[in-house]
């Protein structure tokens, strides 16, 4: 489910493939491998379970290097079969004539495997990928052409997949098939690339072409040819992207995640740039659906994990600033519960990668129901934006750490902009004047920088609490989803029990978890912006403090009411309470990172997690 790289050109393929796999490590993986058509026209493949360094060491210990200029590589995240050498990619046919790598899931692999076993084929792995290797091998024997073999085999495959293959009898050619799984082309001088992510070949070229769904691609060092699944030639468009390899370099930082947290002020500034003017919001991305937006009577926000919590956070402001009812849905549940949708519904889909399979399927479901769709994504020209009526890009820049930080903050900012934009269109007059909201929104980059000044205090707190086995997070209003996100970050990175609760729910059950010494982070709304909410949260703090909880408060500067009740206070700048979540999450992100680092865990690549979840 993770990373693919293919290369054909004059360079040593093994070196290019390994560099590409290094750039794809951030997506998460449990094994890695490469296959190269050698100068002697046979395929040599090496694959190992574990980190990429294990594969590198294996290659370095070889008495003879792998020599060849066309090859494929893969980082695997197990979906069929345990992480092991035999289940790692690439997979080969019985004759060792063909090698393939594959992302996605072949949903009818069990049926196909039974057919192949009945025909006398044997299998060396537990994967669905090996099924495709045998099918392609048989088809090639009939057609003697790898493209035609793919045309035949893709008719039999069900599910979402990107399959990339090389064959010893077509030594300078790579052929791939794409169906609902990320894959794009890179064009160099006398060399071409194929990858699931531009990061894999960014140091060689920024000229790319996105491959549409249900396409077969054949490439060599000097040519690219694309057909549909029926074998009919189709056109493609090459464009240049702005991507510098330094953007995926963590030099000078202990981790990509820490680097990305400190990039949040600039990321928010970039996301806001050109989108506000004189107290109004400008979203030209939505101008072509303006009339449709005027007709909507409700909004549905859809996402998974961190993106869902960004949606929850912003839902309060959309209702307050646009006067529209809002519901928040998990992408993987959305299309299975028969939601009531119509042409007056606006569905907004949030995904950092733009490739989250659950969200992509939800977009298609919504469009079939006649719903207007907007996507909020970070990766340009990814699948979800292509299938949405409109897209508003976050401009967070590349995010390498698996756990999202700056993308989360920028997603909320974009949803705030959308809330204000919808309010403008509808002429809705909220309690908080729109011009003031826009002004305060533009102050956020400076205030985020101020929050980062407490980094050392948060780091020390994490060190003191590194032996904690369970940590709770409480919040009210838009602070509640921030509590959920903070708990998720701690689970993702530090592998300890963490739960987020709405503070008002304490007395309805969760207070039973409170015992002497129990750490509880409480997100305290400012008394200036919301004195009623503030008083309620202080009451909640007193309630759990009386039962021995250790209280760590996230509170605005000048809020003295928390001091008698909190064991520690982490201060954030004063802002309108609608914007407090954007500031409150930052110390909580740092805390999760530093606590995990103190335990010796890899904060950039947590176990079992993938950056882009491209299977259902």
Swiss-Prot record:
Subcellular location: Cytoplasm
Reaction equations catalysed: D-fructose 6-phosphate + L-glutamine = D-glucosamine 6-phosphate + L-glutamate
Domain Glutamine amidotransferase type-2: from-to ranges: 2-222
Domain SIS: 289-428, 461-606
Keywords: Aminotransferase, Cytoplasm, Glutamine amidotransferase, Repeat, Transferase
Disordered: annotated segments: 70-89
A Pfam entry, by short name: GATase_6
EC number: 2.6.1.16
GO biological process: carbohydrate metabolic process; fructose 6-phosphate metabolic process; protein N-linked glycosylation; UDP-N-acetylglucosamine metabolic process
Gene3D superfamilies attached to this UniProt entry: Glucose-6-phosphate isomerase like protein, domain 1 (3.40.50.10490), Glutamine Phosphoribosylpyrophosphate, subunit 1, domain 1 (3.60.20.10)
PROSITE patterns for the chain: GATASE_TYPE_2 (PS51278), SIS (PS51464)
Group of enzyme by EC: transferase
Active site as annotated: 2 (nucleophile), 611 (for fru-6p isomerization activity)
GO (cellular component) term, any one: cytosol
Keyword Aminoacyl-tRNA synthetase: no
InterPro entries: GATase_2_dom (IPR017932), GFAT (IPR005855), GFAT_N (IPR047084), GlmS/AgaS_SIS (IPR035466), GlmS/FrlB_SIS (IPR035490), Ntn_hydrolases_N (IPR029055), SIS_dom (IPR001347), SIS_dom_sf (IPR046348)
S-S bonds: none
GO molecular function, one term: carbohydrate derivative binding
General function of this protein: Catalyzes the first step in hexosamine metabolism, converting fructose-6P into glucosamine-6P using glutamine as a nitrogen source.
Assembly: Homodimer.
Record HAMAP family: GlmS
PANTHER family: GLUCOSAMINE--FRUCTOSE-6-PHOSPHATE AMINOTRANSFERASE, ISOMERIZING, GLUTAMINE--FRUCTOSE-6-PHOSPHATE TRANSAMINASE (ISOMERIZING)
This protein's name: Glutamine--fructose-6-phosphate aminotransferase [isomerizing]
The gene coding this protein: glmS
């Amino acid at each position: 489910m993770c990373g693919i790289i293919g290369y054909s050109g004059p360079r040593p393929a093994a070196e290019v493939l390994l560099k590409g796999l290094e750039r794809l490590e951030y997506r998460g993986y449990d094994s890695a491998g490469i296959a190269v058509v050698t100068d002697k026209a046979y395929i040599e493949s090496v694959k190992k379970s574990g980190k990429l360094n294990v594969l590198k060491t294996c290659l370095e210990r070889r008495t003879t290097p792998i020599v060849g200029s066309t090859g494929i590589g893969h980082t695997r995240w197990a979906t069929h079969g345990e992480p092991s050498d035999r289940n790692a990619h690439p997979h080969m046919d019985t004759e060792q004539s063909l090698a393939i790598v594959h992302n996605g899931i072949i949903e009818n692999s069990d049926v196909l495997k039974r057919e192949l076993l009945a025909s006398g084929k044997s299998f060396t792995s537990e994967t669905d990928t090996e099924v495709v290797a045998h099918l392609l091998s048989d088809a090639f024997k009939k057609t003697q052409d790898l493209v035609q073999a793919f045309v035949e085999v893709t008719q039999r495959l069900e599910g979402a997949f990107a399959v990339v293959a090389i064959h010893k009898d077509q030594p300078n050619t790579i052929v791939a098939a794409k169906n609902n799984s990320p894959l794009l082309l890179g064009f160099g001088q006398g060399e071409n690339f194929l990858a699931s992510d531009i990061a894999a070949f960014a140091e060689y070229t920024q000229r790319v072409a996105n491959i549409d769904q249900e396409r077969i691609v054949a490439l060599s060092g000097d040519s690219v040819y694309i057909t549909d699944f029926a074998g009919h030639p189709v056109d493609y468009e090459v464009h240049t992207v702005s991507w510098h390899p330094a953007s995926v370099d963590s030099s000078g930082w202990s981790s990509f995640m820490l680097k990305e947290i400190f990039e949040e002020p600039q990321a928010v500034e970039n996301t806001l740039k050109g989108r506000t003017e004189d107290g109004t919001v400008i979203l030209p991305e939505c101008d072509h659906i303006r009339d449709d937006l005027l007709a909507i009577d409700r909004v549905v926000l859809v996402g998974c994990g961190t993106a869902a919590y960004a949606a929850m956070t912003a839902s309060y402001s959309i209702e307050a600033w646009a006067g529209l009812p809002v519901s928040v849905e998990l992408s993987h549940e959305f299309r299975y519960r028969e939601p009531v949708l119509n042409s007056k519904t606006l569905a907004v889909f949030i995904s950092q990668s733009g490739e989250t399979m659950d969200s992509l399927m939800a977009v298609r479901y919504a469009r079939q129901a006649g719903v207007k769709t907007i996507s909020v994504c970070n990766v340009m020209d990814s699948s979800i934006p292509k299938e949405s009526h409109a897209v508003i890009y976050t401009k967070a820049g590349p995010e390498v750490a698996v756990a999202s930080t700056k993308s989360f903050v920028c997603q909320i900012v974009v949803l705030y902009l959308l809330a204000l934009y919808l309010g403008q269109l509808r002429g809705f007059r909220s309690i908080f004047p729109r011009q003031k909201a826009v002004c305060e929104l533009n102050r956020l980059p400076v205030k985020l920088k101020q929050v980062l000044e407490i980094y050392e205090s948060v780091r020390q707190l994490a060190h003191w609490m590194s032996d904690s086995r369970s940590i709770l997070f409480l919040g009210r209003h838009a602070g509640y989803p921030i509590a959920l996100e903070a708990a998720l970050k701690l689970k993702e990175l530090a592998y300890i029990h963490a739960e987020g609760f709405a503070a008002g729910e304490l007395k309805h059950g969760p207070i039973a978890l409170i015992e002497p010494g129990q750490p509880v982070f409480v997100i305290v709304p400012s008394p200036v912006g919301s004195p009623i909410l503030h008083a309620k949260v202080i009451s909640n703090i007193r309630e759990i403090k009386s039962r021995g909880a250790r209280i760590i408060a996230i509170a605005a500067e000048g809020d003295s009411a928390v001091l008698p009740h909190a064991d520690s206070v982490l201060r954030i700048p004063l802002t309108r309470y609608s914007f407090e979540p954007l500031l409150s999450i930052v110390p909580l992100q740092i805390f999760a990172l530093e606590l995990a680092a103190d335990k010796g865990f890899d904060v950039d690549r947590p176990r079992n997690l993938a950056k882009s979840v491209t299977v259902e």
